[in-house]
Structure formats: structure tokens, C-alpha cells
Regions:
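Non-heme Fe(II)/2-oxoglutarate
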Residues: 2-11, 64-67, 207, 214-215, ...
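A structural signal for short, well-ordered beta-strand segments
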Residues: 117-119, 157-159, 230-234
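Non-heme Fe(II)-dependent double-stranded beta-helix
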Residues: 2-28, 35-143
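Short Ser/Thr-interspersed hydrophobic loop/turn segments at strand-loop and sheet-helix junctions
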Residues: 164, 211-214
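Catalytic core of non-heme Fe(II) oxygenases with the double-stranded beta-helix
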Residues: 102-103, 128-201, 240-247
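Active-site rim elements
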Residues: 88-93, 195-197, 217-219
Length: 278
């Protein structure tokens, strides 16, 4: 079984500069845990927005109605929704949340582009035979064609909206340091685990930042447990690796994005196109 993780957490209240120790942890381990990153009232609002969005998207999926992105309906209660920025203003707000931007700028780029967004609501009753699904992120087979170790091209951020301090709730699992390896981890053991894997245990409101080449998956799902979380991803401005950029309407780009948020997307998406770098 994978061991559990409770260390490497850095409580965050406002938007301080990223510390040398945080950068060191991210560089060596491939991920960084920021406990209690979102405040309780913010979490409550995001959970309410998630519930409303899930109900609407599941109905759109049932009726075949047009929707932004796509929705995976998994059983009676579990849902995963892709392309969520236009589903609720709170989801769009997290795109450039002031407290997270110093981390995105320091760890990835001073001109980050949006790459992906999704919400996960999962209940153990809908996943009786869940497997970890170990993988690395990125197109073209995880950017493996660029050689090993794979460079940092995308920064992924997971926000726990439910308490994940105890293992067994389909936690994010990671293999620390695996983003630097030149070797494949091989096949999982009989229990489905990779060597050195840990479940990332943290309170509701915690943010987990990780490298695109970090091997990760999902942990065991014990009966009666559930998980709600958001994922956001950022990439370099010279990349066109996100199909989500083509998933939103012209009205979204031209009417609902502030000038600052427009800079998270390529200029050619706007009408008229914006002639700019980044």
C-alpha cells in the first residue's frame, strides 16, 4: 500500500512571495502542497457552485443539449466536467486568483496561459473497482518525444474542496521525484502501487501544485468516502497544447474576460484577433 503524506505543507493566508524552500521542494519532489490555501467561506461558495454546475451539466448530458466542453457521468452520483471557466464566475475567478499567481509566475512563467480546467465529484459507491491509472500529463504521449527528463511545460493545480486528511478517499497519489527520472517506473505492484507512491492527504481548501512529468494517479476508495476537487493547469505562452482554448464561445472571450484575463489565452481567439505576444 502507498504510504500517506502529511508533511511538505506550507500554510498560506495572503499572497506572499514564493519561498526558497517551496521552490526547492517543488524542484526536487515535483509537487508542492499548500494547506488551507482557500478560506472556509470560499470553499463553501465553490462547493455550492459545483453542485449547481453538476446538476446542470448532468441534465445537459442526459438530454443531449449543447454544452461547453464535455461531461463524464459516472454512475448515480459521480461526475467529471471539463472546461468549467464559463460555468460559474467563481470558477473563472480562480484562473488568476491573486494568491496563486506568485506560484504560477515563479514556478512556470511570468506570462502563463490557461491550459485546462475541470471539476471532479466522486463517490466510492460509483467506483467499486477503481484502479490508480498511473500517468504523466501532456500531449504527444506526455511530451516524451522531448527526451528525459521531461521539462516543466505545464503546471497543474488541484484544489481539495472536501477534507482529505485521512487516506482512502480517492486521493491524488504521486511518486515524489519521478519527474526527474530517465526511466519508466515499470508496471505497478499487485496492489496497484508504484514504488514510493504516496497519497496526498490535506485539509479542504488545500492546493497541490505539480509538474507535468510527475507520475500520478488516484488512490484507494474506501466505502462511504467521497471527493470533490477542482483542477486548473497552466502552460507557457508559446505553446498551443490546449484544445480547451477552442472550447469556449466568442462571447466568452470578447465579453466575459477582463483585459488581464484575456492575456491567459492566445490573441487569435478574439474578434478581432489581438496582435500580441503572449
Amino acid at each position: 500500500m502507498a504510504e500517506t503524506l502529511t508533511a511538505q505543507a506550507a500554510p498560506v493566508a495572503t499572497a506572499p512571495a514564493v519561498t526558497a524552500s517551496e521552490k526547492f521542494i517543488f524542484d526536487t519532489q515535483g509537487y508542492l502542497v499548500l494547506e488551507n490555501f482557500l478560506k472556509p467561506d470560499h470553499i463553501a461558495k465553490l462547493l455550492a457552485a459545483t453542485a449547481t454546475t453538476v446538476a446542470r451539466r448532468r441534465e445537459q448530458t442526459r438530454t443531449g443539449a449543447k454544452q461547453t466542453g464535455f461531461t463524464q457521468v459516472n454512475g448515480k452520483d459521480s461526475t467529471r466536467i471539463f472546461y468549467i471557466l464559463d460555468d460559474d464566475p467563481l470558477f473563472l475567478e480562480l484562473l488568476d486568483w491573486p494568491a496563486i499567481m506568485p506560484y504560477v509566475h515563479t514556478l512556470l512563467s511570468h506570462m502563463p496561459h490557461h491550459c485546462a480546467s475541470d471539476v471532479i465529484v466522486a463517490h466510492a459507491s460509483d467506483f467499486p473497482k477503481q484502479v490508480p491509472g498511473w500517468h504523466i500529463d501532456g500531449h504527444d504521449d506526455g511530451f516524451r518525444n522531448l527526451g528525459a527528463p521531461i521539462p516543466l511545460l505545464q503546471l497543474k493545480i488541484g484544489y481539495y474542496l472536501t477534507d482529505m486528511t485521512k487516506p482512502g478517499a480517492s486521493h491524488l497519489m504521486v511518486v515524489p521525484g519521478s519527474h526527474k527520472t530517465k526511466q519508466s517506473p515499470g508496471e505497478p505492484g499487485p496492489d496497484g502501487m508504484l514504488p514510493g507512491a504516496v497519497q496526498v492527504c490535506a485539509p479542504a481548501g488545500s492546493a497541490i501544485l505539480f509538474h507535468n512529468a510527475l507520475w500520478h494517479g488516484i488512490g484507494p476508495f474506501h466505502p462511504g468516502r467521497s471527493r470533490t476537487m477542482l483542477y486548473y493547469a497552466y502552460e507557457h505562452p508559446w505553446m498551443i497544447a490546449s484544445q480547451e482554448h477552442w472550447g469556449y464561445t466568442k462571447d466568452f472571450y470578447n465579453s466575459r474576460l477582463s483585459p488581464a484575463r484575456q492575456k491567459f489565452f492566445h490573441g487569435f481567439l478574439f474578434d478581432p484577433p489581438q496582435a500580441r505576444w503572449g
